[in-house]
Amino acid sequence: MADQRSKTNRWNWEVSGFEPRKSSSNASFAESTGHRTTGPLLRRNSISTPSLPPKQAIASKVNGLKEKVKLAKEDYLELRQEATDLQEYSNAKLDRVTRYLGVLAEKSRKLDQFVLETEARISPLINEKKRLFNDLLTAKGNIKVFCRARPLFEDEGPSVIEFPGDCTICVNTSDDTLSNPKKDFEFDRVYGPHVGQAALFSDVQPFVQSALDGSNVSILSYGQTNAGKTYTMEGSNHDRGLYARCFEELFDLANSDSTSTSRFSFSLSVFEIYNEQIRDLLSETQSNLPNINMDLHESVIELGQEKVDNPLEFLGVLKSAFLNRGNYKSKFNVTHLIVSIHIYYSNTITGENIYSKLSLVDLAGSEGLIMENDSGDHVTDLLHVMNSISALGDVLSSLTSGKDSIPYDNSILTRVLADSLGGSSKTLMIVNICPSVQTLSETISCLNYAARARNTVPSLGNRDTIKKWRDVASDARKELLEKERENQNLKQEVVGLKKALKDANDQCVLLYSEVQRAWKVSFTLQSDLKSENIMLVDKHRLEKEQNSQLRNQIAQFLQLDQEQKLQMQQQDSAIQNLQAKITDLESQVSEAVRSDTTRTGDALQSQDIFSPIPKAVEGTTDSSSVTKKLEEELKKRDALIERLHEENEKLFDRLTERSMAVSTQVLSPSLRASPNIQPANVNRGEGYSAEAVALPSTPNKNNGAITLVKSGTDLVKTTPAGEYLTAALNDFDPEEYEGLAAIADGANKLLMLVLAAVIKAGASREHEILAEIRDSVFSFIRKMEPRRVMDTMLVSRVRILYIRSLLARSPELQTIRVSPVECFLEKPNTGRSKSTSRGSSPGRSPVRYLDTQIHGFKVNIKAERRNKLASVVSRMRGLEQDAGRQQVTGVKLREMQDEAKSFAIGNKALAALFVHTPAGELQRQIRLWLAENFEFLSVTSDDVSGGNGGQLELLSTAIMDGWMAGLGAAVPPHTDALGQLLSEYAKRVYTSQMQHMKDIAGTLAAEEAEDAGQVSKLRSALESVDHKRRKILQQMKSDAALLNLEEGSSPIPNPSTAAEDSRLASLISLDGILKQVKEITRQASVHVLSKSKKKALLESLDELTERMPSLLDIDHPCAQREIATAHQLVETIPEQEDTNILEQSHDRRPSLESISSGETDVSQWNVLQFNTGSSAPFIIKCGGNNNSELVIKADARVQEPKGGEIVRVVPRPSVLVNMSLEEMKQMFVQLPEALSLLALARTADGTRARYSRLYKTLAMKVPSLKDLVSELE
């Protein structure tokens, strides 16, 4: 059955119903065809048999093959040379780019050096500014006293305080014994109850600036209980106190003064003093905080300090410290709370490291009265508070009076604040008082205490002293302004240098992207050259095989040659006998005509356009018998021609039905809703007519239906028929023929063979064979056009085959509307003919294919009356019954056919009509137009059998044949109209393809990637689209047969893809960054890291962050998110000393649980087979899990049957570094036996080497572990 099916499906040259014409050439062709069907499939020469001797033809064929092999070798060597030149050119380009990058790097280094030098010049100015500001504050006084009164509550009675000025406060003592019961106090600043926290802080800010400049500053909140001390320091939720405002000011000033070489850092310590004992409020909850030592002369106390990087962290730490104090409010009144902000400044240029401290002190209540009912503990607490506050007053008094000995040791409070009270330190005391008359005595006591500290300051009542200090302050301000101006200029210069550095970095990024693009182009060209080289090698191999086949066939051809000669001799004799019979018949007919002419006086003309032999009038019995014989012979010959036409029409109908099937599927939803489509047009039996059909305007781009007949570099299926036709068309040489008649005969035979091959291929394979012989057919037609020897009707049929094949595969071409046939026909002297019912239908709105006006073809037919004798003869022959009918003669039909041919030459609109309308439908429309416009040719019930219907058929056939012949005629310097239409349709398809690629690339370029997987998908998708676009461009450049390229330039505009290329370069850079982040995350997947390792990982993440400017803005979030996640992961891993990590690494062994309980979820397994020389090879399946670990699946034991597979995570080769051989064997027990057999050796070193090679071999088969393999290497 298989042999029978192969015989039935074998391709052969037989055409059903086709018999060759009875001539010498056709006879030989028929005989050769008969031999070909019975014998094996042989390759025929395109040269006709009588043209050259057989031996000479075979020798020429062999020589031609040798020349082709030689040309193929030369092409191969040229391609190799081009590849070498391209490689050298790429290397030279890369060298130039590398040198240019070096120059840019040198410029960047110089800019960095210049920035450092500029900052080195700015640093002294900044220090001088700080010194001047500190001198200004010193000139105003190192110790300042502010007074603040809180608002009066409702139940506290009247107020006893007045505010006569900004520096004076007046207290009504209500002492009638005194002449002036009011007592005045002067301070540096006095704040009434209406003053808020912001106004108070505006005067405190210079002390904060001094602390940042390097001076120790202490701010003391002093006063009686419930006077507002704690509110001044802490504030409320909506009006913050000095704690939060001081740190925010420090943070903002540090940010504005920090540079690339200088940096500020802050840490916080919070403690309280109760009964002369220090209690750390931070170390109670966090034991791992770094400590700071406080030297208290007699002892050293360690306090915990926590680093804070922003105001939110500061408030959080401060809140946790306050929570540690507890809820004993009575205890708060006898406790001193101290919040110390430690300020660290470092400069890498000058090597300067500065430490300063800002102490914010909330002192205990100052009432100091001991009641009789107070307990012993409370009395002790009050005594300690009075002692510490008194000692603080003594220290301030000694400092302001200039004494040599300062009593710091009298209290733990003064010892703690010793470094912030004397020398160049700045001290601010804020006295908080209550305006109520109930607390008058405590208020006066607080004011006296504060006045004692302030009155020791040099008196401001001396005008000379005031003038002196004002002059000093004025000079200091002027100098400070000059320094600030110079500092501002230098900062502007630094900004300009940073901008220049940024421009240089941008140039580096652009150049880097260009280098990547050059690498990509070079890689693409190399891959293309490699593929072309492989194709040439395959072609060379095929040529060798064909050459060997031809040599084997030479012997068979020699045997067939003798047989063909004998057959030709027999055919020649038969032809001569037939020609003799025809001559006798013609002489008999001539005698009969002459005898009839003598009787009637007028000769009759023939009405057959295909036969040159006239028909005799039925006069005698002999002439009628001769006429019948001639008619039988002519009918046989015409039947053969009609069969070939019918086969061609069936082929055209199949192509049209296929294209209509595709378009009907697209149109099915819209046919019901369209009111302009008439049912008569939809239900016609033969496809669609030339009338306008509402097709969709745009195809579905997602389906990718835009294809050409041949797709560039796509491999086309080959068939024996296609190979034979390709060779015959390519090898056809007109120079080998003698005379134009021989050339025309050979060329037309080849075109007929093309049509016959497509017919035999059938509807399922007609597109394949058309694509296979496409280049050869178009080259053959282009080569033969200048000689004007081809049958233009055959050329038209071949062109229509290819255009309809293109229409069937291109939905956007099916939307083209063509003009109806009425636009191409008109009656003489009347302009346009009356339109048919189809043309005048109100629902029809045709859209013309061309914008220019279509000139119609004038059908010149006039009604004439015959003479009486002709009418009698016609009645005798039974041809006509009406003497008024039009006499359509052969001459008239030939003239009309010639005029139709001239009209069709170069007419692209008519070509579009032929392409989009089936031939049978088009001829039917022409017959209908003729019947409607020439009434004397109309068919009635009386003359159906008389032949009038035959006249309409003859006229429509003559017009159709003339148009078909004219459409295939070339118009120098252009090709024929159908060829021009094919070129234009191909350009439309290419334009749609390029725009489709542009739209897809634009959509992908605008899509934002969320993670590494989407980045990889986007990159591969953009690279795929770019590769397809380049393939389309290459196909356009090489497809000269369709596009008719001039001087190698592309006729299709190439849309700009700069944005898509930039996004692709950005995705490539982003992919590299994400791979490095993934590698860092993998290295950080441990429990403990060494300090050096952790520092190296963090530096690597910082370097990746610096590479982010090379990415587009759309890719920044993804990179920032991945880097931030990795940075947070590394930061959370505990660190140890390098020595501890090394000791642990020596003791580290892979646990059995880590091997058996690791993650074994693998998406895809890769199978490897190891042949060890035994009967059964080892089969191991390998894959990768989400942790980038190698996972294998194999039989637990080699000798066990299938089904006992186990899955294990394979440890890395580095695990075996410090293992002994026995320990390795124990580890391999948990792994499949095949792995241990392949890896174990006699020694430990040999086992490590074999295991490392085996691990690399397995990992190379897993795509996700290729980076791991490169790391191991």
UniProtKB/Swiss-Prot annotation:
Residues 830-846 have a biased composition (Low complexity). InterPro entries: Kinesin-like_fam (IPR027640), Kinesin_motor_CS (IPR019821), Kinesin_motor_dom (IPR001752), Kinesin_motor_dom_sf (IPR036961), P-loop_NTPase (IPR027417). SMART domains: KISc. It is found in: Nucleus; Cytoplasm, Cytoskeleton, Spindle; Chromosome; Cell membrane. Disruption phenotype: Impaired chloroplast accumulation and slow avoidance movement under strong blue light. Double mutant kac1kac2 exhibits an increase in leaf transmittance and a partial defect in nuclear avoidance response under strong blue light exposure. Residues 1-52, 827-847, 1136-1157 are annotated as: Disordered. Homodimer and heterodimer with KCA2. Interacts with CDKA-1. Interacts with AL1, a geminivirus (TGMV) protein essential for viral replication. Interacts with LUE1/KSS. Kinesin-like protein required for chloroplast movements and anchor to the plasma membrane. Mediates chloroplast movement via chloroplast actin (cp-actin) filaments. Required for the chloroplast avoidance response under high intensity blue light. Mediates redundantly with CHUP1 the nuclear avoidance response under high intensity blue light. May act as a mitotic kinesin. Probably involved in division plane determination. This is Kinesin-like protein KIN-14A. It comes from Arabidopsis thaliana. The gene is KIN14A.
